[in-house]
Amino acid sequence: MSPESKKLFNIIILGVAFMFMFTAFQTCGNVAQTVIRSLNRTDFHGSGYTSMAIIYGVFSASNLITPSVVAIVGPQLSMFASGLFYSMYIAVFIQPFPWSFYTASVFIGIAAAVLWTAQGNCLTINSDEHSIGRNSGIFWALLQSSLFFGNLYIYFAWQGKTQISESDRRTVFIALTVISLVGTVLFFLIRKPDSENVLGEDESSDDQDMEVNESAQNNLTKAVDAFKKSFKLCVTKEMLLLSITTAYTGLELTFFSGVYGTCIGATNKFGAEEKSLIGLSGIFIGIGEILGGSLFGLLSKNNRFGRNPVVLLGILVHFIAFYLIFLNMPGDAPIAPVKGTDSSAYIKSSKEVAILCSFLLGLGDSCFNTQLLSILGFLYSEDSAPAFAIFKFVQSICAAVAFFYSNYLLLHWQLLVMVIFGFFGTISFFTVEWEAAAFVARGSDYRSI
């Protein structure tokens, strides 16, 4: 196998492994609050929203140290160990206890930070400037396809269910745990890419030991430098402006990945299909994500108008979705009790409108995330690690805050928070993009400012 073929093989395996893991984890997150509401009728008392708040809070803090962990352990072993913790979190739902549920939430927060840092490292070492776009697209498509399979199973398995029984819960989460473990094991199929600088056969063992020691020192130096650069980048004008946009992506991530599915499952007006509709909602979020990511990935090379039109499309799509959700869903749906809510929405609650909104949420999310990743890669091509660490830090801490307030705020207040952040986040993105375009037009190096 040629070096290029080996790298492409690694990217495909990386994407398939993440597809299996996140088929399990995203399905788990989508149904967690609904399952826990059924559990709260027993001796178990917990909140899926609180669990996700813990996960994203720990995740954001852990981003500060994970580059050092990956540098020492290596990306492959880091991803494998993280996968085990993901599987452990999912397995907790088979027979949950509050202490194990929240403890696992802490561990998976750390594991998530390690996993995504290692994923970025693995993607980078298996790509060059010519293949990074293609490889990112392959990984994105495989990752987002995870939204289909688990949610498709939920749709058919929970058809006609109004309450989730112990047998239903165990069957689903045993299957999801096995799926997650399959993805975890797949990381061992990733091969080490051929090194461009291989040690000569005539080199002595002393020379090799010296290079190993120097390599370890270099890894430590790089980790410290990245840590320092992260703090310096935090206070630059461009990063502060983009942080508002990033904060919005964290809030809407919480909404479409956890809150919206819960709202659908709690709306009794949907009848016997309310629980299975959670799975169908997840499928259409995935369709929106994949369609948007694929479309904007293909258009990126021929886009004469920059990134702003895509972001504008994203915010318009999201505002339409928020307005329809406001009209179609009862206000108390996010915090409804175990039996759901019989409250009326402003219009007669429609399953078709609910699923349309799922698609719009996914499409809008892909607009924002693809363009944020693009502009960060452009502005900070020489400091990509600390730049993306800040991106993940801001996004995850805002997601944690949103999961926390989702326990208490009615639907219309949650939508209002997203509308405010979405509006100002779009304006701030436009400002940075206009400055970047102006520097390109003048032939200046934007990275020098």
Curated annotation (Swiss-Prot):
Subcellular location: Membrane
Family: Belongs to the unc-93 family.
One cellular-component annotation, GO: membrane
Record's bilayer topology term: Multi-pass membrane protein
Positions of glycan attachment: 40
Keywords assigned: Glycoprotein, Membrane, Phosphoprotein, Transmembrane, Transmembrane helix
Claim: Kinase is one of the keywords in the record: no
Transmembrane feature ranges: 8-28, 53-73, 74-94, 96-116, 138-158, 170-190, 239-259, 277-297, 309-329, 359-379, 385-405, 410-430
Name of the molecule in the record: UNC93-like protein MFSD11
PANTHER family on file: ET TRANSLATION PRODUCT-RELATED, UNC93-LIKE PROTEIN MFSD11
Broad class of where this protein is predominantly found: membrane
Modification Phosphoserine occurs at: 204
